[in-house]
């Protein structure tokens, strides 16, 4: 398993500052995070489908019909809470964690305005630190669009494994590393189409599916599914497909002993 040291926080301060400066934009659906709002229904449905297919409860019964409803969910790197809120609305009991204090203020305020305080809460804590005190406490863990922003993504994946109860499902998303992903995710998204602010991504931190698969296996997970997320700039339409050349999501499961 990846070595995990809680004292050495696995974070790039410049990345935290970058997103803190944009904290006021999280719930502006036409602002800096418009792309996240647009893809949120796709990723939410894919997460729920994988929970239905993979989650196994303590009594070894697959609760396929329930999906996210009734599950304890941890959203790692929750930002302003776009995905966290959506999962809470599906009936999950959600905890979102992030290291950006301004992000969490925006997330908490919006949750209060949306009357979701009973099923949604936020904490300012590294995932490794939470794993040291809350191992095995969650049915589902999500870590979306975060791994390519940290120094040691393997440690994040390892912490996600520790936090899951046996039989739980973890969904990860990141960006593949190849010439096509550089062209689409950086040149296209940041400079040509301006879907994202310039400097949002660092190509060297992109992660291939093989690398993420190895991180997951080393942590103890078994692979469940993988899917690519695609965008047509002419029609402004997003969809899921098997091609994982650029953005992709991976669902993995913690085996039940």
From Swiss-Prot:
Q: Which gene encodes it?
A: ubiG
Q: Does the keyword Iron apply?
A: no
The molecular function terms in GO held by this entry are: 2-polyprenyl-6-hydroxyphenol methylase activity; 3-demethylubiquinol 3-O-methyltransferase activity; polyprenyldihydroxybenzoate methyltransferase activity
State the Gene3D superfamilies in the record. Vaccinia Virus protein VP39 (3.40.50.150)
Q: Identify the Pfam families for this entry.
A: Methyltransf_23
Question: What family is this?
Answer: Belongs to the methyltransferase superfamily. UbiG/COQ3 family.
| Pathway assigned to this chain's UniProt record | Cofactor biosynthesis; ubiquinone biosynthesis
Q: What is this protein called?
A: Ubiquinone biosynthesis O-methyltransferase
Q: Which organism is it from?
A: Psychrobacter arcticus (strain DSM 17307 / VKM B-2377 / 273-4)
User: How would you classify this enzyme at the top EC level?
Assistant: transferase
The organism's lineage? Bacteria, Pseudomonadati, Pseudomonadota, Gammaproteobacteria, Moraxellales
- Disulfide bonds, paired cysteine numbers: none
Q: What does this protein do?
A: O-methyltransferase that catalyzes the 2 O-methylation steps in the ubiquinone biosynthetic pathway.
């Amino acid at each position: 398993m990846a070595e995990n040291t809680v004292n050495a926080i696995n974070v790039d301060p410049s990345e935290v500052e970058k997103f803190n400066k944009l904290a006021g934009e999280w719930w502006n659906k036409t602002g800096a995070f418009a792309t996240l709002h647009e893809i949120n229904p796709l990723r939410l449905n894919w997460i729920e489908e994988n929970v239905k297919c993979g989650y196994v409860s303590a009594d070894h019964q697959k609760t396929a019909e329930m999906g996210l409803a009734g599950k304890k969910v941890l959203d790692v790197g929750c930002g302003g809470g776009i995905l966290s809120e959506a999962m809470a609305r599906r009936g999950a009991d959600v905890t979102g964690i992030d290291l950006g204090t301004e992000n969490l203020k925006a997330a908490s305020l919006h949750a209060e305005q949306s009357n979701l305080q009973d099923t949604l809460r936020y904490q300012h804590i590294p995932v490794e630190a939470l794993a040291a005190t809350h191992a095995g406490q969650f049915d589902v863990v999500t870590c979306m669009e975060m791994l390519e922003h940290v120094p040691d993504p393997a440690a994040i994946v390892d912490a996600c494994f520790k936090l899951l109860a046996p039989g739980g499902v973890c969904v990860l998303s990141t960006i593949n590393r190849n010439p096509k992903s550089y062209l689409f995710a950086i040149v296209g998204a940041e400079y040509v189409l301006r879907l994202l602010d310039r400097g949002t991504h660092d190509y060297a931190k992109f992660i291939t599916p093989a690398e993420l698969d190895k991180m997951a296996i080393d942590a103890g997970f078994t692979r469940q599914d993988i899917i690519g997320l695609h965008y047509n700039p002419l029609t402004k339409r997003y969809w899921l497909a098997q091609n994982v050349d650029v953005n992709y999501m991976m669902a993995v499961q913690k085996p039940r002993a």
